[in-house]
Amino acid sequence: MTVLIHVLGSDIPHHNRTVLRFFNDALAATSGHAREFMVAGKDDGLSDSCPALSVQFFPGKKSLAEAVIAKAKANRQQRFFFHGQFNPKLWLALLSGGIKPSQFFWHIWGADLYELSSGLRYKLFYPLRRLAQKRVGCVFATRGDLSFFAKTHPKVRGELLYFPTRMDPSLNTMANDRQREGKMTILVGNSGDRSNEHIAALRAVHQQFGDTVKVVVPMGYPPNNEAYIEEVRQAGLELFSEENLQVLSEKLEFDAYLTLLRQCDLGYFIFARQQGIGTLCLLIQAGIPCVLNRENPFWQDMTEQHLPVLFTTDDLNEDIVREAQRQLASVDKNTIAFFSPNYLQGWQRALAIATGEVA
């Protein structure tokens, strides 16, 4: 049988590296359909760090899309597993027949599902993408995203699957010894990307708690973001005293990021779509509750796993946050479906579906 090809169609180094390492470490040894990749972006040592994989790199979205389309047309038995997507040319190829529905399997990462950009180019493209998405062979996504997708594409098959967040399962049972009293520390956003709506989030936190909490804003990723970081910092200083505002402009290594998260009492995420699952997982693992926008469908996944969820529309205070911490501490984190290694079973099933081994 023709080997399944995995496609990382946009140059998002952090996520692409996570996916490649997960496949190299957890899937490649047991499945021949977990080894072939086409990636938009630079190698930057990925080939050396993922020796179990065969990875072909392309300088950009356009060249990658052209190569995928050529392979799809040359062999209609060739199947592709698209991780995230973010590549307009591939959507247009699916819509026009360059890639057939039977060749197209898509793991939704969030951004290609929601229509949040206001630019004219995007508004013109969204209806075409919506039509193309009706032709996907099967989508894989979180419970919330599956529900969202099914509202407009009820005939497309959907299967539960979680992004392979880098986690250490041994930390699931580690007690968080942080003092749960006194001034609270609140994490705002999961990166420096504008989709986090940092300024609106800072205003919302201030409206709920005033200048009585310490706010930490991680903005070290993406790079070359200095102007926006300064914009957020100045907006924050209009709301919070200097001692209560910490805007991080440097990218943190994983262990340092983990240490930062464990110093927090609450995560605050105002964005209205599913994103930042990795940060949510690490916070939950550390016993730290999260505030979500009610429009963010990931709350469905959290409640399905019996996790407490706070919403941006709730009246929040320290007592409510402490109660959510208590509830979270009582959850057996080894049973959470979107934690490592539990999500591995979903990936094994996804490969079987994409290759036709499971109907």
Curated annotation (Swiss-Prot):
One of its GO terms (biological process) is fucosylation. It is a peripheral membrane protein. GO terms for cellular component: plasma membrane. Its main location: membrane. It is found in: Cell inner membrane. Pathway: Bacterial outer membrane biogenesis; enterobacterial common antigen biosynthesis. It holds the Pfam family Glyco_transf_56. Keywords: Cell inner membrane, Cell membrane, Glycosyltransferase, Membrane, Transferase. It catalyses: beta-D-ManNAcA-(1->4)-alpha-D-GlcNAc-di-trans,octa-cis-undecaprenyl diphosphate + dTDP-4-acetamido-4,6-dideoxy-alpha-D-galactose = alpha-D-FucNAc4-(1->4)-beta-D-ManNAcA-(1->4)-D-GlcNAc-undecaprenyl diphosphate + dTDP + H(+). One of its GO terms (molecular function) is fucosyltransferase activity. Its EC number is 2.4.1.325. NCBIfam families: PRK02797.1-1, PRK02797.1-2, PRK02797.1-3. Belongs to the glycosyltransferase 56 family. Catalyzes the synthesis of Und-PP-GlcNAc-ManNAcA-Fuc4NAc (Lipid III), the third lipid-linked intermediate involved in ECA synthesis. This is TDP-N-acetylfucosamine:lipid II N-acetylfucosaminyltransferase. It comes from Escherichia coli O81 (strain ED1a).
